[in-house]
Amino acid sequence: MKLSFHGQSTIYLEGNNKKVIVDPFISNNPKCDLNIETVQVDYIVLTHGHFDHFGDVVELAKKTGATVIGSAEMADYLSSYHGVENVHGMNIGGKANFDFGSVKFVQAFHSSSFTHENGIPVYLGMPMGIVFEVEGKTIYHTGDTGLFSDMSLIAKRHPVDVCFVPIGDNFTMGIDDASYAINEFIKPKISVPIHYDTFPLIEQDPQQFKDAVNVGDVQILKPGESVQF
């Protein structure tokens, strides 16, 4: 299995001969190394509806025929208003099996909406974190979130091999809370900081996060770099 980071919260997972992308913010992402014209995916998984996560989902889904997995509200919105054919709606606590592995959505403390060109926001369900089980490994993508103690329950129920955690502050956890979440609650084998440096408001030094973490290994990935099992 291979996990690649592509700026902000975009993760590309390759496992069981399938390709999965999380939060495909590609075209307008100054930190993303991917090209929307050449990306190949079988599944798209969404944590919530903000533009820097919802991103290129419509174009990518139509171009590739990928199945979009997200909240029931996002699935309905994509199907009804954008003509995306392959959607799979879920909600917090739900788990579903796919041919690459399983997806379980868990709690995240954030917000979730998508703003139309007319400026009107559309509610797209609750924000969510994702627990993947692929090739015998557990990956926890926290999504955009603040710190909450039930991260420890998530990790107790699903011992984490790799955790993708936001460190950008302002809109999500910063370095202090993110490192606390890793050290005290999640305790993964590998931590990867995400959701930073894309915009001035979330500029951070990931080395400070690495220095603050005292469990497992911290991998600071540049866009396009990966961890592999």
UniProtKB/Swiss-Prot annotation:
InterPro entries registered for this protein in UniProt: Metallo-B-lactamas (IPR001279), RibonucZ/Hydroxyglut_hydro (IPR036866), UPF0173 (IPR022877), UPF0173_UPF0282_UlaG_hydrolase (IPR050114)
Keyword Hydrolase: yes
SMART domains, sorted: Lactamase_B
Key words, A-Z: Hydrolase
Superkingdom to which the source organism belongs: Bacteria
GO molecular function: hydrolase activity
Pfam families noted in UniProt: Lactamase_B_2
HAMAP family with a match to the protein in the record: UPF0173
PANTHER family documented for this protein: UPF0173 METAL-DEPENDENT HYDROLASE MJ1163, UPF0173 METAL-DEPENDENT HYDROLASE MJ1163-RELATED
Family: Belongs to the UPF0173 family.
Protein name (record): UPF0173 metal-dependent hydrolase SAOUHSC_01815
